[in-house]
Amino acid sequence: KYPHEISAGEAQRASLARSLLTQPDLLLLDEPLSNVDQSFKEEIQVKLKKILSKLKITTIIVTHDSYEAFYLGHKCAIILDGQIKQFDDPYNVYHFPNSVEVVNFLNRGILIPAKVTGENSLENDDLGTIKGNFIKHYPKGSNVQLLLQPEDLEHDDKSNLKLEVVDRKFRGTNFIYTLKTNSDLLIPVFVHSHHEHQHEADEKFGIKRPINIDHIVCF
């Protein structure tokens, strides 16, 4: 094919291959796979990670795709307004964001109002008691914003805590439900796609009690 005959995704793949031919010590990739079809993207990410590791090429990848950053990066820097807001390994960036800005940027959960009721517990008007390990100490009675991520709540049809289903997205191995509380908070929840009872919009969705979160992140 001539250059004008190839797609944007093909052009990106060709550019990526050329950049690796010289086996540089340092490689800067700016949105390297943004135009690649999703069907090829994950396959290329796996191959790219293996090549970079084998050739020991230090690589800085600029991307807006957090999943891409989490998979390819040993370390992740969250940059907002020209400043590094957090620099850590991918696990900590996701599970222990250090600011509301980082939470909003990652868009992988919701902040809900809660009150600290004990050393390992807090209370939310809609969800009731939530228990877990605080990563930062807050005095009893403190009003906080609790980070609730999609994997923090468990589905239980027999529970008396019911939330309204607003939306359901199929993601292969999982469904992502969007649930509405009595105070109109919209909470995302993961459910395995093999679960027997899949809920439709406007149905009630049971949340397992007691709610236990491994690590409680508050602001």
Where are these regions (language model features)?
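Non-catalytic connector elements of ABC transporters
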Residues: 109, 120-219
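C-terminal boundary and immediately downstream tail of ABC-type ATPase nucleotide-binding domains
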Residues: 95-117, 147
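ABC ATPase nucleotide-binding domains
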Residues: 1-101
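Short glycine-rich loop/turn motifs that provide flexible caps or phosphate-binding loops at active sites
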Residues: 7-8, 106, 113, 171
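Small-residue-enriched segments and motifs
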Residues: 46, 100, 114, 163-164
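Secondary-structure boundary/capping residues
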Residues: 57-60, 111, 174
